[in-house]
Regions:
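Polybasic/polar functional segments that serve as interface/processing modules
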Residues: 1-115
């Protein structure tokens, strides 16, 4: 999991991103397209066109890091491109990385009795 401090903001770059990009070009996209500082310690999340891959970049004060996750089944839930840049919580990011709909997480059924 991504080592984050409490109070770290998580930003989704809505729409799709070319997943061939590395951390430097994603940081440039944060600066130019989103109008934010990629070195401020916030997490920036990008999704590819096929929706099964996300990349996350963040600067921890020492250097830039890149995290990538591909789902074996399903797709990452993503806001529509008209929404611009969207801030979510760290818990919502954890749901997203587990393949759960972060907008409306549902409890899973757990039986109380066996048999």
């Amino acid at each position: 999991m991504i080592p984050t401090r409490s109070g770290v903001r998580v930003w989704l770059a809505v729409g799709h991103t070319d997943m061939r990009r590395g951390m430097n070009s994603l940081a440039l996209q944060v600066q130019q397209a989103l109008g934010r500082d990629p070195h401020c310690g916030d997490l920036y999340v990008f999704r590819g066109r096929r929706a099964d891959l996300v990349k996350i970049i963040w600067h921890d004060g020492v250097g830039m890091s890149l995290y990538m996750k591909r789902l074996e089944r399903g797709r990452f839930i993503w806001p529509s491109p008209a929404d611009g840049c969207l801030q979510i919580s760290g818990a919502q990011l954890a749901y997203m990385l587990d393949g759960i709909d972060w907008r409306n997480p549902l409890r899973t059924y757990r039986p109380e009795l066996a048999g």
